[in-house]
Amino acid sequence: MTSPIVTLKSVEQQQDLIITPPTTGLSLTGKITIPGDKSISHRALMLGAIAQGETIIKGLLLGEDPHSTAKCFRAMGAEISPLNTDKIIVKGIGLGNLQEPVDVLDAGNSGTTMRLMLGLLASHPERFFTVTGDSSLRSRPMSRVIKPLQQMGAQIWGRKQNSLAPLAISGQSLQPIHYHSPIASAQVKSCILLAGLSVEGKTTVTEPALSRDHSERMLKAFGANLEIDPQTHSVTVMGPSRLTGQTVIVPGDISSAAFWLVAGSIVPGSDLLIENVGINPTRTGILEVLEMMGADLTLLNQREITGEPVADIRVKHSQLKACTISGDIVPRLIDEIPILAVAAVFAQGTTVIRDAQELRVKESDRLAVMACELNQMGAKITELPDGLEITGPVSLKGSQVDSYTDHRIAMSLAIAALNASHSTTIHRAQAAAVSYPEFITTLQQLCQ
């Protein structure tokens, strides 16, 4: 009887993931269902909470981050059914009707929860809110949303000159703004648009490049009056708005699919079908880069579900080649850069990633961590101020590596370990549950 390829070991309330590829080689075949899109799940819960009437959400991500969002909005008066089934019911309380909570709102590890919620809290006059998060979130920059909100008249206080949580918010009647964001960030854009829902007049956000547009699509579906100018990367909300509850079907998260897209590309003999993947054009940078690297990808059964394009994606093993990733495409694949770094390790030539300094202020410094941990396994990666330089292909060797409690690091290292010689131990692998609770189980099933 052969030993299992993927095993979990509990160590002092942490979980180590041990991956030991067979000496005869490994191939991955079969169908994969991925969890609901995290970005869309957050927004469905939030808009459902502030809409009039009932919102039904199907396919919601049941990970830790949406639980944090639901918990916060329950504390402010919204009724949200338990996040343990495929059908979640949200009974909204209407725009401007969030109640002052009796305790601190805890966003957990979720930057999306904290940043988007700030736009709503700041626009609730005569109510006081305090927001915190875990140690990772308390170290992530919040000034990028606080500064534009303050320009609208918001009163927000925090550590390090109002840039770090915990944050205290005294709700105000805000003024409209035309904000030119220095970075392309869906969280910044969404925060300001959510604040603008309650403001008399036009609130506009202009970005230097296109960021993901899930908020715009969903706000329109819920009845908000939006104007979008794709030429100038501008979005305007006309307030005050009235939102009405909707039925939202959440597609699979392309950021979660990315791990299997790379695994199928780099593990010899692999042939995977990933079902029900959201292919919103503001998120498909991962597909464009993998195709540029020579990946064998086929989009099947393309369709639209509640305003979001969806497809099944087939990926087969191929010989990858290096490429350059920079400029306007980076905001469209920012969360996928850790797993693209893994792909680059096995690609012929030198892959250069630039304009990705945003990764230094995620759940971990993802540029530094991916360079350090993959180099530990034998990769040839040079860290740049805003990216990475990766020379391949190399043969990775099993090692002891750490997720730094960052879900995307944990899963990226697990995929790298599939193509390494000997055993790899990934410390604190339980972090994967933040966005993909079934990741380790799916990995075990594929490797049987």
Curated annotation (Swiss-Prot):
Keyword RNA-binding: no
Pathway given in the UniProt record: Metabolic intermediate biosynthesis; chorismate biosynthesis; chorismate from D-erythrose 4-phosphate and phosphoenolpyruvate: step 6/7
Swiss-Prot/TrEMBL keywords: Amino-acid biosynthesis, Aromatic amino acid biosynthesis, Cytoplasm, Transferase
Enzyme type, top EC level: transferase
Annotated positions binding 3-phosphoshikimate: 38-39, 43, 185, 187, 335, 362
Enzyme Commission number, as recorded: 2.5.1.19
GO molecular function: 3-phosphoshikimate 1-carboxyvinyltransferase activity
Reactions mediated catalytically: 3-phosphoshikimate + phosphoenolpyruvate = 5-O-(1-carboxyvinyl)-3-phosphoshikimate + phosphate
Record's subcellular location: Cytoplasm
Amino-acid positions noted as binding phosphoenolpyruvate in the UniProt annotation, renumbered to this chain: 38, 111, 140, 187, 366, 408
InterPro entries: Enolpyruvate_Tfrase_dom, Enolpyruvate_Tfrase_sf, EPSP_synthase, EPSP_synthase_CS, RNA3'P_cycl/enolpyr_Trfase_a/b
GO CC, alphabetical: cytoplasm
Subunit structure, as described in the record: Monomer.
Function noted in UniProt: Catalyzes the transfer of the enolpyruvyl moiety of phosphoenolpyruvate (PEP) to the 5-hydroxyl of shikimate-3-phosphate (S3P) to produce enolpyruvyl shikimate-3-phosphate and inorganic phosphate.
Family to which this protein belongs: Belongs to the EPSP synthase family.
Protein name: 3-phosphoshikimate 1-carboxyvinyltransferase
Organism: Gloeothece citriformis (strain PCC 7424)
